[in-house]
Regions:
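An acidic/polar, Gly/Ser/Thr-rich interaction patch typically located in mid-to-C-terminal regions
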Residues: 50-180
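Short beta-strand-centered interaction patches in the first periplasmic/extracellular domains
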Residues: 1-52
């Protein structure tokens, strides 16, 4: 049996939406829209508030150049296809292939953008241990500056606050992709 939160996560994923659970409420939002907002904080290399950091790159199931959506209706045998390539594409030349139900080309376009974005945000990740600050929460965006190829905006995917050995926050970050 599947839990309610798991069902909700699956529904959000299918719709290309993001889900955030806090102590008192569940928040569902369009990640692309939210990510377009200005970063709440900028961390500069050498900043005394950064206790430690780790930067990572993954090319496994990420760094796609475009996304091709193709769906054939089993009843009408009509095939709906759409390929999306963002203007800012710097991928590997790989095409992400998606076969999910869509009713028209507009739905295929929306799905292609969301699925490509979902995969490519996993390419660059970072984790920071910083001096404690209650304003750090999952879902907010921050910028890294002075970290060379990692200089960009990131979404906080997890913020673990700890009082052991002094107040610190462990931030898990994944890159924000703007424009799609």
């Amino acid at each position: 049996q599947t839990s309610d939160i798991k069902v909700l996560q699956e529904l959000c994923h299918a719709a290309g939406m993001a889900l955030k659970v806090t102590t008192l409420k569940i928040v569902i939002y369009d990640a692309a829209e939210y990510d377009a907002k200005p970063a709440a904080k900028t961390f500069k290399y050498g900043d005394k508030n950064i206790i430690s950091y780790k930067l990572g790159t993954s090319l496994t199931d990420t760094a796609y150049t475009s996304c091709h959506v193709s769906y054939t209706d089993p009843d009408s045998k009509e095939t709906i296809e759409y390929t999306y390539t963002p203007d800012s594409s710097t991928g590997t030349g790989q095409v992400l292939e998606i076969n999910e139900k869509v009713r028209n080309t507009e739905e295929a376009k929306t799905l292609a953008k969301k699925r490509l974005r979902e995969k490519n945000t996993q390419e660059l990740t970072a984790s920071l241990k910083v001096v404690g600050d209650v304003s750090f929460v999952a879902g907010m965006t921050v910028k890294l500056k002075g970290f060379q190829k990692f200089d960009r905006k990131y979404k906080v995917t997890q913020a673990k606050h700890s009082l052991t050995g002094g107040y610190t926050v462990d931030l898990s970050l994944k890159q924000v992709l703007e424009g799609y």
